[in-house]
Amino acid sequence: MAQQLDKSSDATALIGAMVTRSRAAQSVLGKSDFASRCAALQAAADEIRTQSAAILEVNAKDVAAAKASGISGAFIDRLTLNDERVEAMATGLEAMIRLTDPIGHELARWQQPNGLDIARVSTPLGVIGIIYESRPNVTIDAAGLCI
């Protein structure tokens, strides 16, 4: 039980540190221009390709551990990366580059009876947390959409 509490407090500390770093990054990213965000997405896609062998090696260890613990075949299929899935992660980021900039668009405008003008403008999300179970490619999709 004590070991379980240690793991829990370690996880809590790790998540707290990640949130702190994420908030600091958000304050910079939230002010970045579209070209900079596109460059970051391209750099991430390039790094995925550069590191694909290492990504597949670590994923193979995750898959082996999942199989050893008796996880279902469907779960293991979702967990498993191969060359095609890793390339799809990179091309997915590149597809996001071709989208229009979602930030700064006026979504609605109206005037209150007292004459106050109100505009709804798209803004960066800020820091988000994602909990998922078995699809490592979701990490890249979610991160790309957040950039």
Where are these regions (language model features)?
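Substrate-binding/gating loop at the entrance of the active-site cleft, primarily
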Residues: 109-147
